[in-house]
Amino acid sequence: GCLVFVDGEFWGLYLMGRVNTAETFARRAGGSPEEIQVIENRYPSQIAPEYGELYRLVTEGNTSGHGTYQKILEQMDLESYLDYYCANLYFGNSQFDSFSTTLWRRAGEGETGKWHWEFSDATDTLGRNKVSNYSVNTYLCPGVAEDLFLQGLLKNKDFQTAFRQRMREYVEELTKEKAEEYLTPLLETYRVAVTATAERYGLR
């Protein structure tokens, strides 16, 4: 976040969002940006051709079979997908659905890497608190229940096991106590700025 002043006048606290680019992923994975391919997966009718092969394999293939599932794993980074999906579910990201994500892979000369999933927008994290909590099945939320890619993967027992295990890790590790331990020191840092912003825009 940052505090914005215009000609000395306080304009409030603003959140700075990161833009996912080839440079971003090149710094993380190593190599040059020219070797990184990035796509924005936005609408079912606009599946990028580069991603279409994997998408069709998962949504139209016999994913319950070992052979098909192994072909899928050759094209996707399973750990990345599990973290992406389980985190969005656990944090209740209300802007989350399968067509609001960024995918990237290394695709340099003579090399085609696995697809990785990346958060595109988490500014409304915990925004589902009124419709998705301990008493509501998050899986029934439209962005998840209508996801053909996830449905295809869930036909495979190995994926089911991996998905349950990763979600269990989130539940066991990201507890209320650990969250409070991390967030409480930040509260005092942001309290004044948040209060001033709310007062400026009449949000109190």
Question: What are the roles of these predicted feature ranges?
Answer:
Residues V6-D7, W11-S45:
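Conserved structural core of kinase catalytic domains
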Residues C2-F5, F10, Y14, R42-R204:
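Middle-to-C-terminal accessory/interaction subdomains
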